[in-house]
Amino acid sequence: MARQEQTMNDQLKVRREKMDELREEGIDPFGHRFERTDLAQDLQDKYGDMDKDELDAKQVVATIAGRMLAKRGKGKVGFADIWDRSGKMQLYIRKDVVGEDTYHIFKRSDIGDFLGITGQVFKTDFGELTIKVTGLTFLSKALRPLPDKFHGLQNVEQIYRQRYLDLISNRDSFDRFLKRTKIISAIRHHLDDQGFTEVETPMLHNQAGGAAARPFVTHHNALNIDLYLRIALELHLKRLIVGGMEKVYEIGRVFRNEGMDREHNPEFTMMETYVAYFDFHDVMAETEGIFKAAAQAVTDDGIVTYHDQKVDFNQPFKQIHMVDAIKEKTGIDFWQPMSIEDAQKLADEHHVKYEPYWKVGHIINAFFEEFVEDTLNEPTFVYGHPVEISPLAKKNEEDPRFTDRFELFILGNEYANAFSELNDPIDQRQRFEAQAAERTAGNDEAEHIDEDFVEALEYGMPPTGGLGIGIDRLVMLMTDADSIRDVLLFPTMRPEEDK
């Protein structure tokens, strides 16, 4: 460790000496605006398939800029790799072409430095597209050495804490975040084409609601009140439906003061949509369209590979009622009316854990999670959730024990949650009161009564279909990422000094 620290200190010293040397030669080591004509990938697209002689005849001159991530050669000839946001371009530089002063700058440049390059585009004898340098502008000095170019960052914690180094050294990671942007853009484009209006609603709430989760609490000094970082987008978006907006969506951060694991981060990105006059069947079709658009944004054929398992988003999604799914796997028929004692007995017999305050619907959901959820590999809509676990969903007309709600499962994970929204203010108040009773009985994630939201419903909300999708989990699926931290540029981390 001491030897590594000494090596690092030596490199820091040498790089600062080179910085001073540049200044002595009248060169600003942290340069100025530089105008480039092309990105590396643009040149590859234009000339990558062109014959060597044909390219030479065209006498193509290009100006690029980027970070030098490789350097080789001796004497009066050198090669380097310049990376910009689009990819890599090889440089070929000769002292007799650029002159002694410019070649000296190149020779004294370090891996990590930013260079502006002008030169002729050609192909080497090995067929690699290359720029023969005629002009070099020093743009920025890297005072610290980059991670090893062959191995990148090996410390997982460092990857998340110093994402900028991960992006420099790991092109797969860089590309994953570009895909994230493409996915979100594709979803927005799809919804905009469907006539949705994108809106922004408050992140600071007077009362946490819209989901069963613990909130973060903050304090507003001027008003002298506690406020809650939002745990969901739902209740404000429904207020907009009441106001007549009819077809709205929001993509934004939500915050939950809960545990962290490979699928959960305290702040994450949610998308919710609400459409007047839709029911949950309409929302199923909407959801399929969103997932197909996301898959097409990052694949050529709409088929995504996640951990060596292929998911074909071109095929229609399956649909099954939660009770039927449980019956298929266990033989237990929860369609039959039963008391809480009967349900608890079944749970005991099948080693399904439950809480004392649970009702039959809670136990049905526990059976689903225990025996069914992990088996759902193909995209599958599971609908008909019990009313006890769906306080904001409309009851099913034929069997009011269940709701017009679905969740989308793929490869055993849940990716979307949707309802025919509850628009009866009297029923909504009763659901909130049942949640309040659960909170009193020990469920500290149960919702409070939101009087303002109930009042909004009393002005009248049309039948509405609502949808929620966790964007980060969706991006994990579409980019074959192991952890939510791999799709968040800057995931939540414990401060290093607290270790």
UniProtKB/Swiss-Prot annotation:
Q: Where is the signal peptide?
A: none
Q: Where does Mg(2+) 2 bind?
A: 414
Q: Ligase among the record's keywords?
A: yes
EC number(s)? 6.1.1.6
Catalytic activity line of the entry: tRNA(Lys) + L-lysine + ATP = L-lysyl-tRNA(Lys) + AMP + diphosphate
Q: Which Pfam families match?
A: tRNA-synt_2, tRNA_anti-codon
Primary site of residence? cytoplasm
BP GO terms, sorted: lysyl-tRNA aminoacylation
Q: Where does Mg(2+) 1 bind?
A: 407, 414
- GO cellular component terms, semicolon-separated: cytosol
Cell location: Cytoplasm
Question: Is this entry keyworded Cytoplasm?
Answer: yes
Q: How is the cofactor bound?
A: Binds 3 Mg(2+) ions per subunit.
Instruction: State the family named in the UniProt similarity comment for this chain.
Output: Belongs to the class-II aminoacyl-tRNA synthetase family.
Name listed for the protein in its UniProt record: Lysine--tRNA ligase
Species per Swiss-Prot/TrEMBL record: Lactiplantibacillus plantarum (strain ATCC BAA-793 / NCIMB 8826 / WCFS1)
